[in-house]
C-alpha cells in the first residue's frame, strides 16, 4: 500500500528528533577522545592479562583486555540494557568480568559503554564498530574478529553486523557473530509484552499512577521530565501484590492481583519489578527522548487471557493505539532485516525470564525470509537464566564458531553439545544444551 506523504514526513521528523539519522546522536559536548591507557584488570582475568581503557571521539568509554597467551582472535562485545543513566568510564568492566572465561580461554576482549545512556540501537551499533576500529588501529588487526552481543546487546550486535560487516573496500570487518540471550525480535516487537504488563498491572493495582497522581497514557512510561526510583516502583508493587512476603502472609487482594498479573503476562515473580522498571523508565526514554512524544506501542487488538475474569479484564484494561510514524522510526533504528553475510551463532536459555526464547524463532524467521538461513545456527539450553549462562557453553559456542570458520561447515546443536563437554574442566558449571529444542513463534 502506498505510504501517505504526511506519514513519511512524520517519520522523518521523528528520526530527526531522535537523532537516528546519519551518524546517530550528537557527541557529548564534554567528550574528548582518550587513547587506550593501561588499566588494572578485574581479578577474574588470568594473570598476565593486559587491560586498557579509553574514550572514543564520540564520547564512548571502552575497555580492552589482551591475555598473555592470546590466540589471535578479538571479541568485540555489545552490552545489554540499555542503561538509562550517564555512562561511566568503568561501566564495561561489568561485562568484562561476566565474560572473563573468554579471556581465560585466550581471546582478546573489547567492550564499549556507548556514547550515551538510553535507547538507540544504531547509535550503539556505531559505537561498537568504532571500538573495533580503535582496537585495530592501536593494537593491530587480529587474525580474526568476532562480534558478540548479550541481551539487548544482541539486538545491537545483529544490527552492527547488518550495517558494518563489510567495509567500503569489500573486505570484512568481522569473521563471525555470536548472539547470547539476544533481544532479536527488534524494537517494534521486543517490548510489546512490557506494554501489556503496564496495562494489566494498572488494571489490578491502580497505583502506577495512583488516583491522586496526574494521569498519563501508560505507554509513555512516565510523563516527560518525571522520575521514579526503583525503590518507589518496588514499594508500589509490594503494596499491591505482597511480592516479597510469603504467600500465607498476603492479603486475599494481594494474592489475587499477583496471581492474575503473572498468569496473564507470563512474567515471573522474580522479574516482575525489573520488567515494570523497563516499562517505566525505558519507555519514558524511548517515547520522550527518542520518538518526540509519539507512541510506538499498541494493545488495541489484544485479547488478554489467563485471569480470574478475562471479560472484566478486557473490558477495563487501558487501551492504546500506536502512531505509525513512531513505529516506523523505531523499526528503522532497531528492527532487523535478517540480511546477514557472516556465520552467526546464537545461544539462548529455553526459560529465559528476561528475553523470551521466542525471540529466536522470530529471528530465524527474519533470516529465512532474507534467504540467509544457511548462515545461522541456533543453540538452546535448559536453563532459566538470562544474564549469564553456564561457562562451558560460552566456550563451546566460541569453539564451534572457530570450527565453522576453519572448515566452512555450520555446526549443529549436537556439535556444540559435544564441544561443551570438553570444557567441563574449566569450571564447576554443567553443560545443559538441549539439542532437540526449537522455539515456537510468538504471534504477539
Residue ranges and their predicted role:
Residues 1-33:
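Secretory targeting and sorting signals
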Residues 69-70, 131-151:
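Gly/Ser-rich "nucleophile elbow"/oxyanion-hole loop immediately N-terminal to the catalytic nucleophile
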Residues 72-83:
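Short beta-strand element of the alpha/beta-hydrolase
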Residues 144-206:
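Primarily recognizes the serine-hydrolase "nucleophile elbow" in alpha/beta-hydrolase
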Amino acid at each position: 500500500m502506498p505510504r501517505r506523504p504526511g506519514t513519511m514526513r512524520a517519520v522523518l521528523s521523528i528520526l530527526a528528533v531522535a537523532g537516528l539519522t546519519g551518524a546517530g546522536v550528537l557527541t557529548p559536548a564534554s567528550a574528548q577522545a582518550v587513547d587506550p591507557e593501561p588499566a588494572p584488570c578485574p581479578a577474574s582475568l588470568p594473570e598476565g592479562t593486559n587491560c586498557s581503557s579509553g574514550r572514543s571521539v564520540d564520547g564512548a568509554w571502552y575497555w580492552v583486555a589482551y591475555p598473555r597467551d592470546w590466540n589471535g582472535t578479538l571479541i568485540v562485545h555489545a552490552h545489554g540494557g540499555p542503561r538509562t543513566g550517564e555512562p561511566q568510564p568503568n561501566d564495561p568492566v561489568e561485562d568484562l568480568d561476566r565474560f572473563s572465561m573468554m579471556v581465560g580461554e585466550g581471546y582478546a576482549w573489547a567492550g564499549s559503554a556507548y556514547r550515551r545512556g538510553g535507547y538507540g540501537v544504531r547509535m550503539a551499533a556505531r559505537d561498537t564498530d568504532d571500538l573495533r576500529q580503535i582496537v585495530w588501529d592501536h593494537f593491530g588487526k587480529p587474525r580474526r574478529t568476532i562480534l558478540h552481543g548479550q541481551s539487548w546487546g544482541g539486538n545491537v550486535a545483529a544490527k552492527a553486523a547488518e550495517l558494518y560487516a563489510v567495509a567500503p573496500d569489500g573486505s570484512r570487518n568481522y569473521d563471525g557473530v555470536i548472539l547470547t540471550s539476544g533481544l532479536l525480535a527488534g524494537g517494534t516487537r521486543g517490548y510489546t509484552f512490557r506494554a501489556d504488563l503496564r496495562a494489566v498491572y494498572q488494571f489490578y493495582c491502580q497505583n502506577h499512577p495512583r488516583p491522586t497522581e496526574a494521569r498519563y497514557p501508560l505507554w509513555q512510561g512516565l510523563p516527560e521530565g518525571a522520575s521514579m526510583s526503583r525503590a518507589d516502583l518496588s514499594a508500589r508493587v509490594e503494596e499491591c501484590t505482597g511480592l516479597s512476603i510469603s504467600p500465607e502472609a498476603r492479603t486475599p487482594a494481594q494474592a489475587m492481583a499477583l496471581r492474575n498479573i503473572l498468569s496473564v503476562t507470563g512474567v515471573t515473580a522474580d522479574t516482575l519489578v525489573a520488567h515494570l522498571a523497563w516499562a517505566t523508565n525505558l519507555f519514558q526514554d524511548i517515547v520522550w527522548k527518542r520518538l518526540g512524544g509519539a507512541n510506538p506501542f499498541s494493545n488495541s487488538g489484544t485479547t488478554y487471557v489467563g485471569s480470574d475474569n478475562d471479560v472484566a479484564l478486557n473490558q477495563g484494561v487501558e487501551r492504546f493505539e500506536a502512531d505509525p510514524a513512531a513505529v516506523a522510526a523505531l523499526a528503522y533504528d532497531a528492527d532487523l532485516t535478517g540480511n546477514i553475510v557472516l556465520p552467526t551463532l546464537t545461544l539462548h536459555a529455553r526459560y529465559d525470564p528476561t528475553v523470551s526464547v521466542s525471540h529466536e524463532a522470530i529471528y530465524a524467521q527474519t533470516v529465512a525470509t532474507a534467504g540467509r538461513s544457511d548462515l545461522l545456527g541456533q543453540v538452546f539450553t535448559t536453563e532459566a537464566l538470562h544474564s549469564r549462562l553456564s561457562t562451558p557453553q560460552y566456550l563451546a559456542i566460541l569453539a564451534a564458531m572457530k570450527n565453522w570458520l576453519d572448515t566452512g561447515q555450520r555446526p549443529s546443536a549436537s556439535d556444540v553439545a559435544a564441544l561443551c563437554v570438553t570444557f567441563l574442566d574449566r569450571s564447576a558449571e554443567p553443560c545443559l544444551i538441549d539439542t532437540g529444542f526449537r522455539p515456537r513463534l510468538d504471534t504477539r
